[in-house]
């Protein structure tokens, strides 16, 4: 999967189209990412008492995972880009590059 934790991404389709956010968690086995402030849902939790006796529960708003095909990585210029790879000459490791300007991500 070409999107990693910490990347800034732009949502390109869906109800949050045009929103930018930071990837909080990547789920490569499910091809999904959790983006900060995007795809917010209301989750209804049962009321329960915690160890101090205070009750917690009700309606909680939180982010839900979004499919990786609905986001694009934003390059250093702030434009959405596809992601490519190149082999680093010094270390021999794969490095992600932006297809728009060729710079490292």
Swiss-Prot record:
Keywords recorded for this protein, A-Z: Ribonucleoprotein, Ribosomal protein, RNA-binding, rRNA-binding
A GO cellular component annotation in the UniProt record: ribonucleoprotein complex
One Pfam family of this chain: ribosomal_L24
Keyword check for Transcription: no
GO biological process, one term: translation
The keyword Nucleus is assigned to this record: no
Highest taxon listed in the record's lineage: Bacteria
CDD domains, A to Z: KOW_RPL26
GO molecular function, one term: rRNA binding
Family: Belongs to the universal ribosomal protein uL24 family.
Function noted in UniProt: One of two assembly initiator proteins, it binds directly to the 5'-end of the 23S rRNA, where it nucleates assembly of the 50S subunit. One of the proteins that surrounds the polypeptide exit tunnel on the outside of the subunit.
Classification via NCBIfam families: rplX_bact
Quaternary assembly: Part of the 50S ribosomal subunit.
Protein name: Large ribosomal subunit protein uL24
Lineage: Bacteria, Bacillati, Actinomycetota, Actinomycetes, Mycobacteriales
């Amino acid at each position: 999967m070409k999107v990693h934790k910490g990347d800034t991404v732009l949502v390109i389709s869906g109800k949050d189209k045009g929103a930018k956010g930071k990837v909080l968690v990547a789920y490569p086995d499910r091809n999904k990412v959790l983006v900060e402030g995007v795809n917010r849902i209301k989750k209804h939790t049962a009321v329960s008492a915690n160890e101090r006796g205070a009750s917690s529960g009700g309606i909680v708003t939180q982010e839900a995972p979004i499919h990786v095909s609905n986001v694009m990585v934003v390059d250093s210029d702030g434009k959405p880009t596809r992601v490519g790879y190149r082999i680093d000459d010094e270390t021999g490791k794969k490095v992600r590059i932006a297809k728009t300007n060729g710079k490292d991500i």
